[in-house]
From Swiss-Prot:
Catalytic activity: D-glucose 6-phosphate = 2-deoxy-L-scyllo-inosose + phosphate
Active site: K142, E244
Co-factor: note: Binds 1 Co(2+) ion per subunit.
Residues that bind NAD(+): 42, 73-76, 105-109, 129-130, 140-142, 151-152
Domain of life, source organism: Bacteria
SUPFAM superfamilies: Dehydroquinate synthase-like
Protein name: 2-deoxy-scyllo-inosose synthase
A GO biological-process term: antibiotic biosynthetic process
Known cofactor(s): NAD(+); Co(2+)
Pathway annotation from the record: Metabolic intermediate biosynthesis; 2-deoxystreptamine biosynthesis; 2-deoxystreptamine from D-glucose 6-phosphate: step 1/4; Antibiotic biosynthesis; ribostamycin biosynthesis
Function description: Catalyzes the intramolecular carbocycle formation from D-glucose-6-phosphate to 2-deoxy-scyllo-inosose (DOI).
Amino acid sequence: MQVTPIAMEDASFAYRLGTECTEDVVARLATLGASSYLVVADTTVAGLYGHDLTARIDKEAGPAHLLTHESGEVHKDLTTVSVLAEQALERGADRRSVVVALGGGVTGNITGLMASLLFRGIRLVHVPTTVVAMLDSVLSLKQAVNATFGKNLVGTFYQPVEVLADTAFLRTLPPREIRSGLGEVVKNALAIRPAMLDRLGDALRADARYDDETLRWIIAESLTAKADVTRDDKHERRTGLVLEYGHTAGHAIEHASRGEVAHGAGVAVGMTIAAEVSRRLGHAGPDFVALHRELVAAAGVEPAVPAHVDPALVKNWLAYDNKRGYLDSPPGHTPMVLLSAPGEVLHTGPMPLVPVPLALLEEAVDEAARRGRDAAPAAAYVGPPAAGPLP
């Protein structure tokens, strides 16, 4: 497996990437010398990979137990964390146990939060099985679950001891999840690494068919992008906030859909809304908005709020964005990450955020919703989150 050191201030861990490397994954886990291995997966991933991986860990590394949770964003909450923690303790978890998060971003966040709480923190290893997880969520120390009032509002910062990624897991992903992952890649290119835009534009496939070489390049570029902005900001409260590009409207769309809109697809649409906001504020021109829509469409996501999502609900969730409090924003404003051009982030003082009038943001959401009503449904965000073979 190719090893990339990940360093964020005083936090560091190895990211190991390969293809068809399950033996290497098990061998790396064995080196940790755990008293037990607690593999956490949703019910879908458990059927595809969880039982087999747990059996191999049990045979080659040490006692292993598979803990499962229901699939989907609607189950990413404290109740699920509590149930899994009780199951872990029932199976004899102790301070020398290792928790293995096997799955996508939902499982990674649930498991990461559980690992941070058990015995006030036991070792965590991510084994991501989705594009979003491989190139985005496992590279963050943020471990959070949803609350009634919005996404990712309850959580901690907690680092894994390793990330073990095998692109072979991606072969069973439905196109919806592949497209979702590419939404985050487009974000990285637009906000952090504009040098990758030309190659990415050529590589994007609306049918979501990518070979292993392209996927490894996409993941490697995303590792570099994230490292560029988190090296001196492990908690993503300063330069790392750039990673929130597209997330203000994106999270609102995702939450309003009750998980039917995949995370990366929500972020992709959220970026097109952010670009339109930037245009309306006079920071960017129409060509910049067009570039966003072209890239998002090339990734297979309709660049509009989907017709089945109520724009009134989207606008309601905007007020609960998790970036509130970073700026002393005037009443009726919310802080957003905005760009004036690819790689050109707007700042308020040292912070990569701009206070945006909620009324203006809501107008941009309404405009995107009108375009969505005129568009054909896009597979990237239509359908329940557990419709495909992976979450």
